[in-house]
Amino acid sequence: MKKILLYIILFLSGIDGAWALPIEKEGMSIYSPSLKQEVSYSIILPEGYEHSETEYPVLYMFHGIGDYTSWLEYGNVARVMDKMIKEGKIQPFIMVIPDGYLSYYSDTYDGSSLYETFFIKELVPYIDNNYRTRKDINGRSIIGFSMGGFGALSVSLRNRHLFGSVVALSPSIRTEKQYMEEGPQKGWDNQWGRIFGGVGKNGNQRLTSYYKQHSP
């Protein structure tokens, strides 16, 4: 699975349109009791999935600020996947792209939004139960960009028994000094304070115990 992540990084740009695409299912959804709403996701199945009994490794892809369609629309990830498989550089795998909203893929400190709980307790088991996946640590990986990079590191570090590898591309992470000094206050409150606590605070008062538990 680590080889898959490496090649995806190398091939995320410069893909031409000459390759047939794997099975691409966009606009799928799952109801989340933790979030109390439907959560959209896309899933890309390797060519030949429908005609085999193989169990495939799964790559979960966390997007940055924006929405979950950006990996497919701008990142060409389905073409990347298909090209690498056809060239024999990697073995076939399943790609899952959930809508992460602006959650940083974290549970909020006050319990008002439980995205990590949804991902770990609901989405991963749902994918394992409804698709032919490898259900072991070496069969699951996460890759994330920006906000998704933060989430990939944060989620995988607290759930090491589930994920065998992780890649964070330009992750939205801060040193403690940057976190304490970042402004303007309203922007910090909306981006960080609402998730990790410390709304309206400055300096070391922003370094809540909840933030320290979740910051990569």
State where each predicted segment sits.
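Sec-dependent N-terminal signal peptides
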Residues: 4-14
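Non-catalytic cap/lid and distal C-terminal segments of serine-dependent acyl enzymes
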Residues: 19-216
